[in-house]
């Protein structure tokens, strides 16, 4: 009787954090809460491949004083790609202020969202 050993490696899912606002939840602590969540992402083993910022979440990638700016910068340094919606940056007149990550477009965002597991905060 022969024994066969098969090693099964768990499939790691590609993930994207999709941010629609510059805060998590609602209320007075939402801005600082999101900064804490983003900071906690640095500690997890399976970091997301992308963080996508749309609507007023782009303010986090353009304002160095925003509580979430540093965690986003740290995530970028750890290899996470940070993308900001170009139309949103244009609407808020923030294109020239983009200081972390890259400007993206609707096509690229949809390509990523349809091929990655999404985390929304």
PLM regions and their residue ranges:
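A glycine-rich helix N-cap at a beta->alpha junction
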Residues: 67-91
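General beta-strand structural signal in soluble alpha/beta enzymes
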Residues: 53, 83-85, 119-121
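C-terminal binding/interaction regions
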Residues: 103-106, 110-121
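Conserved mixed alpha/beta catalytic, RNA-binding, or beta-rich assembly cores of soluble enzyme
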Residues: 1-65
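Short amphipathic alpha-helical segments and helix-helix/interface helices
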Residues: 38, 69-73, 110
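Glycine-rich anion/phosphate-binding loops
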Residues: 31-32, 101-103
